[in-house]
C-alpha cells in the first residue's frame, strides 16, 4: 500500500527500495512486483524457510504464513541489486548474500563489510561510503 502511495508522488525511476535483515523479504518482493530504480539489501537471508532450518530446526516450517523467498523474488527483479553484508554476521551469515547474488538475473553487486556483525550497518563508514557512491553513480 505504501509503495502505491509513493508511486503517486514519484516516478518509479526515482524510487529506491531497501530492506535490512527480515525486511529484505518485503523489499525483494516489492522490487520483483514493481519497477524501482534499484534494490538495496542489507544482511539479507536466502529465504525464510532456509533461515528457520539453520537457526531453529526444531520449529516446523509449515507454520510460516509468509515464506518470504528472497531467492525467488530476486530472479524477477529488473533493477540493479546491491547486497551488503557484514563478514562477522552470526545471525544471518554472509554466505546467504553470496548465494543470493547467484540468483540475480540483473546487474548485482555484493559488498562484504569487514569487522561488522548483523547490527550497526547504517553507522558503518564503509557502508556509508559505498551507498554514497552508488547513489551518486545512479544519479539519485
Q: What name fits each language-model region?
A:
Residues 24-79, 125:
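Hydrolase active-site cap/lid region
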Residues 124-140:
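Catalytic active-site module of serine/aspartate enzymes centered on a nucleophile-bearing elbow/loop
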Residues 10-21:
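Alpha/beta-hydrolase fold nucleophile elbow
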Amino acid at each position: 500500500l505504501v509503495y502505491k502511495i509513493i508511486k503517486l508522488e514519484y516516478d518509479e525511476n526515482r524510487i529506491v527500495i531497501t530492506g535490512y535483515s527480515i525486511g529484505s523479504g518485503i523489499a525483494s518482493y516489492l522490487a520483483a512486483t514493481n519497477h524501482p530504480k534499484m534494490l538495496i539489501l542489507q544482511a539479507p537471508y536466502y529465504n525464510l524457510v532456509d533461515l528457520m532450518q539453520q537457526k531453529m530446526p526444531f520449529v516446523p516450517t509449515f507454520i510460516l504464513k509468509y515464506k518470504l523467498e528472497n531467492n525467488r523474488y530476486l530472479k524477477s527483479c529488473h533493477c540493479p541489486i546491491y547486497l551488503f553484508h557484514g563478514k562477522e554476521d552470526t545471525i544471518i551469515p554472509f554466505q546467504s548474500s553470496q548465494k543470493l547474488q547467484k540468483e540475480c538475473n540483473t546487474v548485482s553487486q555484493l559488498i562484504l563489510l569487514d569487522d561488522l556483525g548483523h547490527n550497526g550497518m547504517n553507522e558503518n563508514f564503509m557502508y556509508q561510503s559505498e551507498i554514497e557512491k552508488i547513489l551518486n553513480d545512479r544519479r539519485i
